[in-house]
């Protein structure tokens, strides 16, 4: 571990592996240039062979002593990497950022003030801009505030939370941690366990994050990703089922994911490719229509 840290108000946690240099620099700079200055920025490099990323992080660290750098000796995965940062995080709150996303300048200031003024809130999110590889805004993500007050109902009905927009009480993340056995969906699993523990969610109805959507993968990669996503959704739900026995929305997501997973496993690849092509064409037509 490299760097020093007093007790800041907020610790920012970032895990990086092989994100493009441009994205990594933009992400680091977005934290260093926050209007709120009292924070520590813990960056974990999960690829010990990525010498360029190490060089970039150390260059920023020389200019900003708030940056704490950890290099894993081997690839541990995002969950374990984030947990290493969480273990040394200090202060009342932890903010998450991924190494290809951008925190808008007042993110930490506004989230910290909101948490301080609403002490009953445990996890706080924000509105998000979805951006492309060049930083162009693709979509605005604006979930309604009232849905966070009924999180047990709406969390399983629709997409409400974007992980790198989260600020959470340190004691909660240190207690629950990310499940390191999950390759995917560690954030989803963490949120389900927070809901099971009756922690309170909320959202600031302001845009405080730019969330990067990568270029569209080829169809084989997309099939693999959807298969993995469905599998780990099933695994996460099954693991936490005792807390949601009577939650009909929880079980709807479970059975929907089961159907999707079985469909992908049992359907010939060439048919899946045809269905993906049809979906892409519909998306193009819809986009042109707007």
Swiss-Prot record:
Its EC number is 2.4.-.-. The keyword Transmembrane helix does not apply. One of its GO terms (molecular function) is hexosyltransferase activity. GO terms for biological process: biosynthetic process. Pfam families: Glycos_transf_2. InterPro entries: Glyco_trans_2-like, Nucleotide-diphossugar_trans. Keywords: Glycosyltransferase, Transferase. SUPFAM superfamilies: Nucleotide-diphospho-sugar transferases (SSF53448). Belongs to the glycosyltransferase 2 family. This is Uncharacterized glycosyltransferase MJ1057. It comes from Methanocaldococcus jannaschii (strain ATCC 43067 / DSM 2661 / JAL-1 / JCM 10045 / NBRC 100440) (Methanococcus jannaschii).
């Amino acid at each position: 571990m490299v760097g020093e840290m007093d007790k800041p108000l907020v610790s920012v946690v970032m895990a990086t592996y092989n994100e493009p240099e441009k994205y990594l620099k933009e992400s680091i700079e977005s934290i260093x240039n926050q209007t709120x200055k009292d924070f520590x920025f813990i960056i974990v490099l999960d690829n010990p062979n990525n010498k360029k990323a190490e060089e970039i992080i150390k260059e920023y660290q020389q200019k900003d002593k708030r940056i704490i750098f950890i290099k894993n000796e081997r690839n541990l995965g995002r969950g374990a990497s984030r947990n290493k940062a969480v273990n040394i995080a200090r202060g009342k709150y932890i903010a998450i950022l991924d190494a290809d996303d951008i925190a808008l300048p007042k993110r930490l200031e506004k989230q910290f003030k909101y948490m301080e003024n609403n002490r009953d809130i445990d996890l706080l999110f924000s509105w998000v801009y979805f951006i492309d590889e060049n930083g162009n805004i693709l979509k605005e993500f604006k979930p309604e505030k009232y849905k966070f007050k009924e999180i047990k109902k709406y969390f399983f009905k629709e997409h409400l939370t974007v992980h790198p927009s989260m600020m959470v009480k340190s004691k909660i993340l240190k207690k629950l941690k990310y499940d390191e056995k999950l390759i995917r969906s560690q954030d989803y699993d963490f949120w389900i366990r927070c809901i099971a523990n009756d922690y309170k969610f909320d959202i600031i109805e302001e845009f405080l994050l730019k969330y990067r959507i990568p270029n569209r993968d080829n169809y084989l990669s997309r099939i693999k990703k959807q298969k993995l996503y469905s599998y780990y959704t099933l695994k996460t739900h099954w693991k936490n089922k005792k807390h949601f026995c009577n939650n009909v929305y929880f079980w709807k997501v479970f059975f929907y994911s089961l159907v999707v997973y079985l469909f992908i496993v049992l359907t010939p690849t060439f048919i899946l490719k045809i269905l993906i092509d049809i979906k892409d064409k519909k998306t193009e037509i819809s986009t042109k229509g707007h």
